[in-house]
């Protein structure tokens, strides 16, 4: 097993750790910051494993499969936890899920026709914006910052902040999904 794949497996292992920390944060608010640390480390492994795989020629079929799957599961797990807490709307999660299923379906059709649809720049941007946005939501929705910002800046600060992040994630996700289909529309022919 390559170093890059081992790093990807670390990300996979961190997903249930993140979920447990999020559940514990309901009883122990400081655990939201532990959740942030776990999520941030998991997100950083996405950058690291890709760079290592390319630099040291460790690109494998397992890595090509596992890396994007780990990204999707990590991000969707965080969004689902935020939905449960009432700070990430279900419609935004549905946009993300729909895009992921649609692009995966498009890729499967392409493979059936002997083509591979490579990751587009917009897909990488979607991942970066989503992971950064979720990190910011974890950071600022913690008890300390939420109370500080809502009390001393504006009572509705957190609501507005969360909606801006959700909006950015939804827009970049929609753009990325549309771009994949526009650039590869010939795959859907005959």
Residue ranges of model-derived segments:
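Alpha-helical transmembrane bundles and membrane-interface segments of multipass inner-membrane proteins
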Residues: 1-190
């Amino acid at each position: 097993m390559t170093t890059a794949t081992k790093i990807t497996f670390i990300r996979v292992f961190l997903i249930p750790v993140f979920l447990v920390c999020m559940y514990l944060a309901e009883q122990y608010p400081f655990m939201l910051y532990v959740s942030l640390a776990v999520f941030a480390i998991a997100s950083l492994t996405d950058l690291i494993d890709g760079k290592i795989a390319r630099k040291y020629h460790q690109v494998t079929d397992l890595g090509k499969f596992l890396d994007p799957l780990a990204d999707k599961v990590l991000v969707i797990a965080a969004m689902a936890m935020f939905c449960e807490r009432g700070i990430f709307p279900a419609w935004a999660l549905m946009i993300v899920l729909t895009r992921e299923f649609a692009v995966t379906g498009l890729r499967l059709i392409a493979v059936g026709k002997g083509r591979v649809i490579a990751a587009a720049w917009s897909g990488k941007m979607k991942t970066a914006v989503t992971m950064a946005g979720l990190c910011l939501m974890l950071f600022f929705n913690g008890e300390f910052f939420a109370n500080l910002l809502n009390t001393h800046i504006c009572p509705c600060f957190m609501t507005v902040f969360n909606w801006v992040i959700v909006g950015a994630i939804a827009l970049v996700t929609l753009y990325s999904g549309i771009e994949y289909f526009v650039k590869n529309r010939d795959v859907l022919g005959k």
